[in-house]
């Protein structure tokens, strides 16, 4: 009797968890798929089938088949996908349901979508033997597509089954999926996005005699090695690409130059830059020049940035607002304010990037009031500020209070100091912080982003209005305007609801 009670309680808990997971997945698919592609399914049947698969996943086949057959569910592709979504990391329930669908529903035929879904789950659970067996079976059935190649290569490469990655291309070629450079490029791209660049290079080299790589192959590999910071391999591929007779690729050169600049290797980056200008100068766009100009401006080399900028304009390359903003910021950091404002006046259609360059530069040189004036003009001209705008202005006026620190004592001090301030004991709080600094512990940094986020509600609207009044009373008009503007334009759920009702009426 006690066993029966425990079993029933366990079934209830399992059912509730599966029901919650099912409802979430049902909502997800209802928003992703169009009404014309969704086949209505019985939710009770789905819950019952998932419960049986979970409880009977280790039971004999006869018992599992008996339980599933008693449900009388209608097996469709949507039903199979919903079952798979309830077991994202459990291969056994999904695989056993797949076998059941093959033996007891002969009219049901799997598609590439259902096969890929099941294959991805088995791969995520790291059952490599079953995964490899099913990957070959799907190829024999003619259900392989580009997504199948991506799933197989990603899973095998993650498990360091590199020979199988190459063999998969050979097997698929035998099944009628001929060697194709586009398919290989998509596979290499998938591996590079997962930071599996060494594995991608292995596949690339082994398949080179069967599939001739193109410009996209080399570009993807170069970008992948740059993303992981391996510039030596990226340079080797760059040279190999040149030896193969390909033109200098703009995107690959831009990525190498950008990575070198991130590592502050300016001399090497400038060599790449001038090689690109000499060989592909007529095809370079503003984004290529902007990478160099932006780095030079941020590192105080404004005169060199102006030379690159002038060369860019001589070649007739269009100058976008992001490039203008970089130059404006670079001039302001060097306190060449008049020149910076002269550039602003020369911009035909200034957008938020121009104003951000101005505000950021003025804040950098401790001109927060002037930055706030730019903020006001920005609003007058119809350019709506974003969260980053408010954060820059608040840091300019209030500074970065404290520093970030993982020390647990910092968290204790945060709570303790906050409680002292709420209690009105400001003098005691100040003395405590002074003692804290003397003992060598840093005060935690005040996070303006979290502050604005936490008060993005109706209570925050009232609070910002009151804050603006108090700040004006003590002649802090700039801060008052910033907080008042944020409170007025802040979008809350209640305001959206009221606005929708007004539009309906």
Swiss-Prot record:
The keyword Electron transport does not apply. PPR repeats lie at residues 145-179, 180-210, 214-248, 249-279, 285-319, 320-350, 351-385. The keyword Repeat applies. It comes from the Eukaryota. Keywords: Repeat. NCBIfam families: PPR (TIGR00756). Belongs to the PPR family. P subfamily. This is Putative pentatricopeptide repeat-containing protein At1g26500.
